[in-house]
Amino acid sequence: MQAALNAEKCYIFSDVDGVYSSDPNQIKISKKLNEISFDEMQEISDAGAKVLHNRCIQLGKKFDLDIFAKSTFSDNKGTKITQQIESSEVKNIVKNDNLIQVFMKKKSVISDDEFLKVYRFLLDNNIITELYRKSINKKTIQFVIKKAEQNKVQELLEKKFKDFYVSQKNFVKLAIIGYGITQDNEILKKVISILKKYDIKVQDINLNQMKIEIILNRISNDVVNEIHKSLIK
């Protein structure tokens, strides 16, 4: 609508007064951001934070239209989402623990046909998966689902694939977001040091230009709080 009206600004009102450096309900030292880029905002949304709808961010970037996230209940300035990237620093930390990793194990090697059959079955039952893959020994299929669907998925798979042993375990994504942060090795070193201090094992690390994503099986808000304090001043 903003683009169609050729408006200069778009204001989106909600029950929070802008975009924060982390979830203020979980991390009490979270800080409101004055400005953030569309690309960084997209990464925050993709990481699981429910701040702005993906489509809203995509349209803002496409039409080069600044978006202001503000509170319905106050006159505070809010957060400006724009094309411009101010600086290379950590802007946001997202903990997504609403996930479960599913393992489907078989005594014999899983054929390519079986691998695809399981995937099609999940699609047919409207189960959205991430990281769908086969283990190196080709005897386990593993993937990630939303925690809300864990009982449904367990029941469906056990009923359909009786020659597989189905198990689950906790799966947590910790995303550290900010343009160019992967060029600063000290950021990841600090995070790994804090995780090691609390004996939290890292399962995987994924990097792109704007995000460090660390896969864990657990992490408390207190630990995230310490990471936040270390990275965001």
Annotate each language-model stretch with its function.
Residues 1-233:
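C-terminal catalytic "cap/lid" subdomain
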